[in-house]
């Protein structure tokens, strides 16, 4: 599906630079080349030639590239002028090209929109290009590049294919069976549904890791009053925002710092000391601390090694909720007083780090541990930098698959199962942009790009 009009835009950032690129796409690309280059460059070959005005005056000299449809970024004829990065010269050449009848200035993201419309990329890949441009770390850039190369798209396409095959199997049963499903069919379909749900769960886990990569994991520091929580918070955040005193209950509200470890974002939360208290303000702080614990990715439980001699979390904190024990690291602080050595070890599946926030002994162990922890959270089967629409559509698809499973278990109703699968397939196709080419929808996606992309 080619668009009839031709577009042009400066494809490099505003301002002076070593190079400035003007990109043209559409049927007029050949005509533009003959006017402003005096000839059509060889296809896919960089040529160093003069750039001319309409009147034949030399404007600049640089590299010209021509890509013939459909073997181009947009799927249309594409011409690029790679000139010196002078804003004045670039704008003059741009205005000259725009003066040719049938040429117009490209809208933000329109080159990529045409690439999508012409089947060169899907919506996931287009959005991943935006994620790559806006990435704040090497890891985020790598993850975006994986999606550009089709990793996420392949996962969704495989799900769609699985659902299509299952729908065909069900519809054959409907056509050739007097009753609904026989026992063999039911077991086969149940197995296929379970497999689809499992693959959706894996994708959702990749979404969670992608969110950590993009937004940062949440590390909550907890412990009894005066155990050294705020001192460790200050060390990790690199400042002294938390007040440190020997008075119990000094921290009464949540303190939050956003830091980077090896270019991976990390959110550190300092909380009120957890204890029984009659102080109304301190009680509010403790309730807020408990709320942060529930939404954390990992917990650092700070203990005073000079008082708490045990490494067993059940003895340190007997009433602690059992379902979050697996994401707790025990930090044995104040080893300068207890005379323990700085180290990391494992006791009953909990990592234990011995350090002194006062002297700095063992702090390097904690920093390295947090870096490794981030890598562990991110490296399981890859990360997907998911958009809100991806998350919502995959959730809808999963709900439809679960509904299909319930209908199969309870009623053996083939028509209803097939319909739930059809809706699930439609949700997954929306992620790729299949059968969803309305102007409003595409404008919402591509208007976030810069002009020239």
From Swiss-Prot:
Binds 1 potassium ion per subunit. One of its GO terms (cellular component) is cytosol. GTP binds at residues 226-231, 245-251, 270-273. Exhibits a very high intrinsic GTPase hydrolysis rate. Involved in the addition of a carboxymethylaminomethyl (cmnm) group at the wobble position (U34) of certain tRNAs, forming tRNA-cmnm(5)s(2)U34. PANTHER family: TRNA MODIFICATION GTPASE GTPBP3, TRNA MODIFICATION GTPASE GTPBP3, MITOCHONDRIAL. Its main location: cytoplasm. Its EC number is 3.6.-.-. Belongs to the TRAFAC class TrmE-Era-EngA-EngB-Septin-like GTPase superfamily. TrmE GTPase family. Its cofactor is K(+). (6S)-5-formyl-5,6,7,8-tetrahydrofolate binds at residues 23, 80, 120, 453. It is an enzyme of class 3 (hydrolase). Pfam families: MMR_HSR1, MnmE_helical, TrmE_N. Keywords: Cytoplasm, GTP-binding, Hydrolase, Magnesium, Metal-binding, Nucleotide-binding, Potassium, tRNA processing. It comes from the Bacteria. The keyword GTP-binding applies. One of its GO terms (biological process) is tRNA wobble uridine modification. This is tRNA modification GTPase MnmE. Homodimer. Heterotetramer of two MnmE and two MnmG subunits. K(+) binds at residues 226, 245, 247, 250. It is found in: Cytoplasm. GO terms for molecular function: GTP binding; GTPase activity; metal ion binding. InterPro entries: G_TrmE, GTP-bd, GTP-bd_TrmE_N, GTPase_MnmE, MnmE_dom2, MnmE_helical, P-loop_NTPase, Small_GTP-bd. Mg(2+) binds at residues 230, 251. The keyword Transferase does not apply. Residues 216-375 form the TrmE-type G domain.
